[in-house]
Amino acid sequence: MNKRKHMDIRRLIISLPAIMALWGGLASCDKMIYDNYDDCPRGVYVNFYSQTECAENPSYPAEVARLNVYAFDKDGILRSANVFEDVQLSAAKEWLIPLEKDGLYTIFAWGNIDDHYNIGEIKIGETTKQQVLMRLKQDGKWATNIDGTTLWYATSPVVELKNMEDGADQYIHTRANLREYTNRVTVSVDSLPHPENYEIKLASSNGSYRFDGTVAKADSTYYPGETKVVGDSTCRAFFTTLKLESGHENTLSVTHKPTGREIFRTDLVGAILSSQYAQNINLRCINDFDIRLVAHHCNCPDDTYVVVQIWINGWLIHSYEIEL
């Protein structure tokens, strides 16, 4: 009896290396197990980080909690679509994007797409990277309120899955830089005798995005932002917007409510870029804008006020001469 037990244990010990070798072969697509590599699972591991041109080191934003990740081939056709929940970015963490075939791929990723957005139809093997991925929800001309949320976008360098028959790796690794696609904009108007009579608005045609992070053509949409009186001669409004960039009608306006007359209207991004101090306000590095407009009484037909100075993040970017 004991002799048989010893024999069974010995057989088990002898067979363990064989079992481990078999498991390792299955896990790594060993040629000893597979006749070829056609059924071998493959893919790209992606590490996500965030770093602007102005930052010395990468960061790993804690507010990124969800990732929608897409892989497109060299022809711009979608080959893999994945959603990862409860994300926690770190230098060591990677996410696997499964792929079936050898070839060149680019990874596009969006962080924090939620129920504020409508997602377009997605079909593996048909959808192109130039198609619209999502649209910010809106009611008429007003966008849904995205205060307290952030949106992020990343793209990887082109990566290549090579033929494993030639000794290539089963999986490859890359990184993708998440850039924030939301802005927080505080606008104050000073030197108004009756600040309760004025309304601040901010609109942009940036509510739709393609898979590749570019803005799709859309009508201008107003972002919610209540104008409040914050002093004897000051009113203020706060807005959370999607990415403000040149060419998309980023219109900031101030209206005198009793008459309906606009006392100020400008393309916000255009005003920044046309300023001699534009180099101090790098739109690639800044997501928070503190805008101060200084008003002055003018010799106008309706005896009202106009804006004579524009300050952004402490910089006087424009001043205007008026007839007093």
UniProtKB/Swiss-Prot annotation:
Membrane topology: Lipid-anchor
Listed GO CC annotations: cell outer membrane
InterPro entries listed in its UniProt record: FimB/Mfa2/Mfa3 (IPR014941)
Compartment(s) where it occurs, according to its Swiss-Prot or TrEMBL record: Cell outer membrane
Entry keyword set: Cell outer membrane, Lipoprotein, Membrane, Palmitate, Signal, Virulence
Miscellaneous comment as given in the Swiss-Prot or TrEMBL entry: The name (minor fimbrium subunit) does not indicate the abundance of the protein, but is derived from the greater length of the major fimbriae. In strain ATCC 33277 and strain ATCC BAA-1703 / FDC 381, major fimbriae are 300 - 1600 nM in length and about 5 nm in diameter. In contrast, minor fimbriae are only about 80 - 120 nm long. This length difference is observed only in a small number of strains, including strain ATCC 33277 and strain ATCC BAA-1703 / FDC 381, and is due to a loss of function mutation in FimB, a protein that restricts fimbrial length in other strains.
Pfam families, A to Z: Mfa2 (PF08842)
Lipidation (N-palmitoyl cysteine): C29
Effect of gene knockout: Minor fimbriae are longer than normal and are easily detached from the cell by mild shear stress.
Subunit and partners: Mfa2 is not part of the fimbrium itself, but anchors the fimbrium in the outer membrane via its interaction with Mfa1. Linear, head-to-tail oligomerization of fimbrial subunits mediates assembly of the fimbrium stalk, while the minor components Mfa3, Mfa4 and Mfa5 probably form the fimbrium tip. The anchoring subunit Mfa2 limits fimbrium length and is important for solid fimbrium attachment to the outer membrane. In its absence, the minor fimbriae become very long and are easily detached from the membrane.
Protein name: Minor fimbrium anchoring subunit Mfa2
Family classification: Belongs to the bacteroidetes fimbrillin superfamily. FimB/Mfa2 family.
Biological role: Anchoring subunit of the minor fimbriae. Regulates fimbrial length. These filamentous pili are attached to the cell surface; they mediate biofilm formation, adhesion onto host cells and onto other bacteria that are part of the oral microbiome. Fimbriae of P.gingivalis are major virulence factors.
Free-text description of this protein's post-translational modifications in UniProt: Palmitoylated. Palmitoylation is important for export to the outer membrane.
Lipid-binding residues (covalent, S-diacylglycerol cysteine): C29
GO-annotated biological processes: pilus assembly
Signal peptide location: 1-28
